[in-house]
């Protein structure tokens, strides 16, 4: 056991109100790439950068291309929870982890057994008709091609926060409440540069901050512990 893992274990064992704040890096070990990572093949297939395609304006003006990208890049129905998801669910079952605040939309925390999951950017598992409000699951989107439509004729929109759209106010308020009450905040798999989500961590006033991320982030200087190993590999040793 490395000194970093020992220290992390000490912090976890001495805390009874842990909050985990995570991003795309939490799910990469489940085989879900960060949609922002583009390569040569990306530019052969898509005319626009992902931030443009995943905007409200693009969704409204070009729904066919939006859903082509959405199915190809945002949905990973075969992905399974990794060691990080499982360890967090275990800590919650023990009563020490009070909430998972995630920027991910894949539902893998719930699949691992986590109950208190605040999804800042929504979920691919929730979809609603824009006209009548009828609910549709992920399977309904996967079963269709092109623009998915409700039986009433309306477009079925994923409950995923697009660029230019606001975050759910109730989810934000609950995230702030959980962060303010936490004594240990573990931030993992996020570069903390997607706002307003990343700005939430300023509401944490607890004793200890841990950062687990492959690349350095500005908050490293304020952290009690910084780990640059993969998050699943790290948490599985605690």
Which positions does each model-derived feature cover?
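Conserved catalytic core of sirtuin-type NAD+-dependent deacylases
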Residues: 1-238
């Amino acid at each position: 056991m490395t000194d970093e893992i020992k220290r992390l274990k000490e912090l976890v064992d001495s805390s009874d109100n842990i909050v985990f704040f995570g991003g795309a890096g939490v799910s990469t070990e489940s085989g879900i790439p960060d949609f922002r990572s583009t390569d040569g093949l990306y530019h052969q297939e898509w005319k626009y950068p992902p931030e443009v395609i995943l905007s409200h304006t693009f969704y409204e003006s070009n729904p066919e291309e939006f859903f082509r990208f959405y199915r190809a890049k945002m949905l990973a129905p075969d992905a399974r929870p990794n060691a990080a998801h499982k360890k967090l669910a275990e800590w919650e079952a023990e009563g020490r982890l009070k909430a998972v605040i995630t920027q991910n939309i894949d539902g893998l925390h719930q699949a691992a057994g986590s109950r208190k999951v605040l999804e800042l950017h929504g979920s691919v598992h929730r979809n609603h008709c824009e006209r009548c409000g009828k609910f549709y699951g992920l399977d309904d989107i996967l079963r269709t091609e092109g623009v998915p439509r409700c039986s009433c004729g309306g477009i079925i929109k994923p409950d995923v926060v697009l660029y230019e759209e606001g975050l759910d106010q109730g989810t934000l308020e609950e995230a702030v409440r959980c962060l303010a009450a936490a004594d240990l905040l573990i931030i993992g798999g996020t570069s903390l540069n997607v706002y307003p989500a990343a700005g939430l961590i300023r509401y944490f006033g607890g004793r200890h901050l841990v950062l687990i991320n492959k690349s350095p982030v500005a908050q490293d200087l304020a952290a009690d512990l910084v780990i640059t190993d993969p998050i699943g590999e790290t948490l599985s040793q605690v």
